[in-house]
UniProtKB/Swiss-Prot annotation:
Gene3D superfamilies: Mannose-Binding Protein A, subunit A. Belongs to the snaclec family. GO terms for molecular function: toxin activity. Keywords: Disulfide bond, Hemostasis impairing toxin, Platelet aggregation inhibiting toxin, Secreted, Signal, Toxin. This is Snaclec agkicetin-C subunit beta. Expressed by the venom gland. It comes from Deinagkistrodon acutus. The lineage of its organism: Eukaryota, Metazoa, Chordata, Craniata, Vertebrata.
């Protein structure tokens, strides 16, 4: 009986230490692969959303995606909270200086952007990225490295 209690206590200690791996994230944030994510339902412009994120923590920004698995994780968090599937992400063309090149390989030296800064939203239901005027309001996702 004493051995059973000792083993049970040891397993409890291991479980509690492992369950604390996401504890680096503040309350209401979700943890994935060493990053913390916050889904914000309130609609803001891209700049307001980015400002909101940086006000949470200095190193926090609108979400950036680096794998399909990360997108799937964010979708699993946004779907239950939002009534629709469009959220601001960290991509933008505010400075109109995309690193584009012509199909013949020459650099983009002449620019004729429309003058309306474009920011990127993610359609989380099918992982499409769409360009929208930065002045439109959308929900968004913040991210920082834990």
């Amino acid at each position: 009986m004493g051995r059973f209690i000792f083993v049970s206590f040891g397993l409890l200690v291991v479980f509690l230490s492992l369950s604390g791996t996401g504890a680096d994230c503040p309350p209401d944030w979700s943890s994935y692969e060493g990053n913390c994510y916050l889904v914000v339902k309130e609609k803001k412009t891209w700049a307001e959303a980015q400002k909101f994120c940086t006000e949470q923590r200095k190193e926090c920004h609108l979400v950036s995606f680096h794998s399909a698995e990360e997108v799937d994780f964010v979708v699993s968090k946004t779907f239950p909270i939002l009534s629709y599937d469009l959220v601001w992400i960290g991509l933008n063309n505010i400075w109109n200086d995309c690193m584009l090149e012509w199909s013949d390989g020459t650099k983009l030296t002449y620019k004729a952007w429309s003058g309306i800064p474009e920011c990127i939203i993610s359609k989380t239901s099918d992982n499409q990225w769409l360009s929208r005027a930065c002045s439109r309001t959308q929900p968004f996702v913040c991210k920082f490295q834990a």
